[in-house]
Amino acid sequence: IILMGGRTGRDGIGGATGSSKVHTEESIEVCGAEVQKGNAPTERKLQRLFRRPEVSRLIKKCNDFGAGGVSVAIGELADGLQIDLDKVPKKYAGLDGTEIAISESQERMALVVDPKDVDKMLAYAAEENLEAVPVAVVTESPRLVLNWRGKTIVDLSRAFLDTNGAHQETTVTVEVPTREGNVFDKQEVKDVKEKWLSMLSSLNVCSQKGLVEMFDS
């Protein structure tokens, strides 16, 4: 399995769970690292490479890197995997095994190719000025194994991963809404201008320019 494209950093760590949390105006001060940093030039190189027929024919299976990083993007590709986190290209030193495994740094792809085609795929990547490194191998044992600095830091059975977690049940009570304040009970608009300005002042309707400039869009 070849990791191709951008390098791995701390950006995006916790993004998968962070997107489901309640955020406030102070979130930008404490949750900035959960947002990935885009890399348009590298993305364009990947697109150009994948459009080449001689390249796409060598790919048995592939995944882009999103929520969960290496542990998910590579972890989904086969039932049995040995992943060497030391081989993952990094943006800077100091990352530990957990950070490398779950970082959601963007513009990365994981490709499954036949062992005899690895050198050929690496050569094609070099032609597009893309960094590409073999970081994992598919194994017969149905386990996801992550190694870092000579130690096994993750060793999970595929049967456990396929259960989607522990079974949970909860009791839910839905209260009947009162007539007053019912969102489905629409009132006749008496002042169009006032209603219009009220809508435009809503955070869900107003211009999102500030957010687009602040985060990865």
Language-model regions, residue ranges each:
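Glycine/proline-enriched, intrinsically flexible loops and inter-domain linkers
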Residues: 1-217
